[in-house]
Design a protein with these regions (language model features):
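Core, highly hydrophobic multi-pass alpha-helical transmembrane subunits of bioenergetic inner membranes
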Residues: 1-279
Length: 279
């Protein structure tokens, strides 16, 4: 039953894009958010669920109010931009992402961290891009820099890596949605969904099963941006899409990508070493 509820929540994120008006978009997001709350109560799994749940409800409520005001009156269009900053975890609203993402099940993490990002398509569809472009690029760039540092200072474990990696993706999607075309954003999202779907399956396996040297190389190939791997194809497509963005943003994205790959490599090696010691 719980899986059906979360599946319905994910479906509503996609439906929100074809509602035809701002109120329909807001209503679908509200329903998706309410349904996703069920994912915090996973039987048989012990999480520190109440602090993340309260944080999620409060931030979702604030974001919802801002979005509702923005879609109802053009004067408050800036509020839509602020709502997306909160939902995507863009600087300075990064903290809730770490708190929530590291204390939920993998299914809910995929829903909140990957599927919900489809809502960024609303930005070019609704023509929201305006005076907020420079501010959006600046905050996205800062988000990438801070996330790069967080890899080495603020995270622990696989879910922590996924959370910070998601912050970088949010920055990329926001910048692309404001500076490029709808189709560029759509292509990037499709590649991201495919790559993340495979990676999430591997991360779930990596967290729950001790790996041996025989599968260590396979994990490196799947997760790292090695030529012909899914991650490499996703990164390569990202490079082509962001070429029209300011050079400063591209440099910050490169910094983030290098930090991400180095930390991921260290994570796999560390997991392998732990397995060897146990054996």
């Amino acid at each position: 039953m719980q899986y059906l509820v979360l599946l319905s929540s994910g479906f509503l994120y996609f439906i929100s894009l074809i509602c035809g008006n701002g109120i329909g978009f807001w209503l679908c997001l509200e329903m998706a958010t309410l349904l996703s709350v069920c994912g915090f109560f996973v039987p048989g799994i012990s999480f520190n669920r109440y602090n993340p749940l309260m944080c999620f409800i409060i931030l979702s409520g604030v974001s919802s109010i801002l979005l509702f005001l923005g879609v109802n009156n053009d004067i408050f269009q800036l509020f839509i931009f602020l709502s997306f900053l909160i939902k995507l975890g863009i600087f300075p609203f990064m903290g809730w992402v770490l708190l929530v993402y590291t204390n939920v099940s993998w299914l809910l993490l995929f829903l909140l961290g990957v599927v919900s990002k489809v809502t960024t398509l609303y930005i070019p569809l609704s023509g929201l891009v305006g005076s907020e472009v420079s501010l959006g690029l600046t905050l996205s760039g800062l988000n990438l820099v801070v996330a790069s540092l967080m890899f080495w200072k603020s995270i622990n474990g696989i879910k922590g890596f996924v959370a910070v990696s998601g912050l970088g993706t949010s920055s990329l999607l926001l910048a692309v949605s404001m500076e490029t075309t709808f189709y560029s954003l759509l292509i990037l999202l499709v590649c991201y969904f495919i790559s993340s779907g495979v990676n999430f399956l591997v991360f779930h396996y990596l967290e729950n099963v001790s790996i041996s040297s025989s599968v260590n190389g396979l994990l490196f190939f799947i997760l790292l941006a090695i030529p012909t791997s899914l991650s490499f194809i996703y990164k390569l497509i990202s490079v082509f899409i962001i070429m029209s963005l300011p050079l400063s943003f591209i440099c910050m994205w490169v910094l983030f990508s290098i930090s991400e790959q180095l930390f991921l490599c260290m994570l796999i090696v560390e997991k392998s070493c732990v397995t060897i010691k146990v054996i």
